[in-house]
Amino acid sequence: MTVTVLVPGETGRAALAGQEWADLVVYDPDHDWPEPASSAEVLVVPPAAHTADRLLAAMPELPKLRLVQTLSAGVELWEGKLPDGVLLSNARGAHGGSTAELAATGLLAVYRQVPQFLANQAGHKWDQHPTETLDGKRVLVLGAGDLAQSLRSQLEPFGATVTLVGRSARAGVRSFDEVPELLGGHDAVVLMVPYNDQTHHLADAGFLARMPDQAVLVNVARGPVVDTDALVAELTAGRLRAVLDVTDPEPLPADHPLWDAPGVLIFPHVGGNTTGMTDRAWRVAAEQIGAFAAGQDPPNLVS
């Protein structure tokens, strides 16, 4: 079966060119739909947050729309907001390895004091002293999907012990109900959960208080999963450390106290932003749309 697919820009046309199931129509997310859009059954949406509201408002103009396909794993901009009867599929699997890699990089940088040594280098200061190591560290990962599995495979060769947490307990995965009792027994906590009403401020003051002194909080999920004010208080007190690829607010204002808090390493939301990112996202999107065109549910169906 051939389906009409709206793709954002010529990059989308090039990525899906040659797919026999696709009749491609290019659109500009910042402008009105092109004339052939009325027959579109699939809409591929860009990851840029600033276009989401406009596209959602214009979706009723697509009477045949049946599937919205994202190019990111996060779907908080779209979930629960689509017209009735429209499916939502994401790009889970496209960015898991690179996002996990950044989380591992952050932990290594904190334990080996890379920011301090860089500051010493800038000041031409030779300060030889011992550091911590990832070997033997107990890492609690809130998440059990492809990101979490990838992180575990990256950390365990360093000698770390990794515990995954999912919505329900199963082989090799603990339940979210156990998180309060698990926090105190781990040296690092990595947030890899989707952002929704249930995970908003998941890492609040009470959550952070249960973490041991000098534990490291790593957030590669979404900024609002962490209560920023509560985290700044813990960092300022010198009790916890943090690695953040995402912040709340984001982008982080230049005068925000988080920038100058001790013990924090901040990345500007670049976990998945690596060489080949776009190609990987479109490859996953093609798999999802191809399944839909064949009359099947997309493997990454969200809702």
Task: Identify the meaning behind each predicted range.
Residues 55-64, 80-84, 207-213, 234-238, ...:
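Short, conserved loop/helix-junction motifs that constitute active-site signature segments
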Residues 85, 135-139, 214:
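Phosphate-coordination loops involved in phosphoryl transfer and adenosine-cofactor binding
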Residues 117-150:
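Glycine-rich NAD(P)-binding loop of Rossmann-like domains
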Residues 41-118:
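Phosphate/diphosphate ligand-binding glycine-rich loop within oxidoreductases
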